[in-house]
Amino acid sequence: MSVVLEDAIRSNAWPFIEAKKILDSLNGKAPEKGYILFETGYGPSGLPHIGTFAENARMVMVQKAFEQLSDIPTKLICFSDDMDGLRKVPSNIPHPEMVAQYMDMPLTSIPDPFGKCKSYGHYMNAKLCAFLDKFGFKYEFYSSTNCYKAGMFDEMLIRVLEKYDEIMALMLPTFRDERKTTYAPFMPICPKTGKVLQVPIEKWDAKAGTVSYKDEDGNDVEVPVTGGHCKLQWKPDFGMRWAALKVDYEMYGKDHLANSRLYSEICRILGGKPPVQFCYELFLDANGEKISKSRGNSISVDDWLKYASVESIALFMYKNPARAKRLFFDLIPKNVDEYITLNQKYHLEEDMVTRFANPVYHIHHGNVPKIETFGLTYSLLLNLTAVCNTSDKSVLWGFITKYEPKATPNTSTYLDHLTEFAIRYYNDFIQTHKSYLVVSEKHKIILHDILDMLSNISDQTEEESIQKAIYDIGMKSGYENLRYYFKDLYQILLGQNEGPRLGTFIKLYGVEETKKLVEEKLLCHTVA
């Protein structure tokens, strides 16, 4: 066993923990199909959102961790439930009144309200694939409609007929009495209307491969369960799919957790082996409600990428997947700065166990680029943008190159992108919310002390010395808690409740420029 493999096995990073579960489930043998199948799912009722990105990003992290532990080939499929009947018209699509005419129709049988694809389902599938391709995910796309119609599930659908009573015995206790009288695992596709029907099944014939039901006119209708003439209810469908495709690893949101036992039992009833499963918590919007594709009540990936790199959003996805997290734009600077810190720690660390525990290893699948920001952070650049009040990144670069002559837009591309992100974020979220504190007599004394300190240092003074001097002024200013001292300074100088280490900020902004800023605040006791 190689040293790297030993270190990977010892790692407590959650992707490696999941990968070891998969390896343990194999009992030392590769599957008969010759590869490990990872599956993610997509409900194409609405556009791909940040949760879609999260599931696929996390899945690939586990897939790549498994590839560190084993030489068994792997494959990732993204399965679209595009044969589901439309239950609700999304609020964020064009021509909702047209779409409303096709309630209960399979998503791939509804005209595309965007006017670009064969159907609504095809449009959403295309958006999904474009979304996944944009971020470099390597996957195979599976359409539920295609799988059913092409006969890929036919063998398992016949087996569902053969095990009909056993499956009903499993499912019925989970329903209320009223639903028990109407439930059936099969949903016929109406030959007349094309709708996905939720009707009681009157008869079923495993040998003939058919089910019978009464239509809305009371007529007996017999249809084959194969060839796309029927679809399974979503709970049996989940378990059937695991058995048919021989899925080895599946991720799903907490909304599936209560039904995971049913999925697994149905898979076993059909002769399959349930996959290793991982349940992640759901993202919440600003009101603490579950984000939804159809409601469009979340930050989109494109929204995030307007203000930060993809690595920062991947870091957010990596952290604590089993914990519910709210999505706010305020999270972006924090995640960018955390990524910068973790990237630097990774390249300073030689111990592979520690490296494997670093999120950036999993974000970059082991090929971690080395970035250099020369001690500058997103938060610091936001503050620099605030005092400069500029939308011109060359203004920021004037301060950056003075602070660190080695840094240039051409040689420090990550830092250059960071300046662009900071300007956008400042313009959209900070500028209109700045609120400056009225300068009191106590504040005037503090500001004069800071001016005196600045007059006795130069741009060559180390930032730690500047920070200590600012701290010492605070110590003698009568604050019981220095937190409020710094908060007052941030509100006076930057119009914000929070801010950077002032030693670093002054070093970046420049001693003379900082003196001018302080003098300006002394002259203008309040700024609207």
Curated annotation (Swiss-Prot):
Highest taxon, organism lineage: Bacteria
Transmembrane segments: none
Family of this protein: Belongs to the class-I aminoacyl-tRNA synthetase family.
NCBIfam families assigned: lysS_arch, PRK00750.1-2
Intracellular or extracellular location(s): Cytoplasm
Stored PROSITE patterns: AA_TRNA_LIGASE_I
Organism: Rickettsia prowazekii (strain Madrid E)
One Gene Ontology molecular-function label: lysine-tRNA ligase activity
Span(s) of short sequence motif 'HIGH' region: 44-52
Record EC number: 6.1.1.6
Binding residues annotated for ATP, in chain numbering: K293
Gene Ontology CC entries for this record: cytoplasm
Catalytic reactions on record: tRNA(Lys) + L-lysine + ATP = L-lysyl-tRNA(Lys) + AMP + diphosphate
Keyword annotations from UniProtKB, A to Z: Aminoacyl-tRNA synthetase, ATP-binding, Cytoplasm, Ligase, Nucleotide-binding, Protein biosynthesis
InterPro entries per the UniProt record, alphabetical: aa-tRNA-synth_I_codon-bd_sub2, aa-tRNA-synth_I_CS, aa_tRNA-synth_I_cd-bd_sf, Lys-tRNA-ligase, Rossmann-like_a/b/a_fold
Motif 'KMSKS' region location, chain numbering: 290-294
UniProt xrefs under CDD domains: LysRS_core_class_I
PANTHER family: LYSINE--TRNA LIGASE
Record-given protein name: Lysine--tRNA ligase
Principal localisation: cytoplasm
Gene (UniProt): lysS
A biological process term (GO) from this entry: lysyl-tRNA aminoacylation
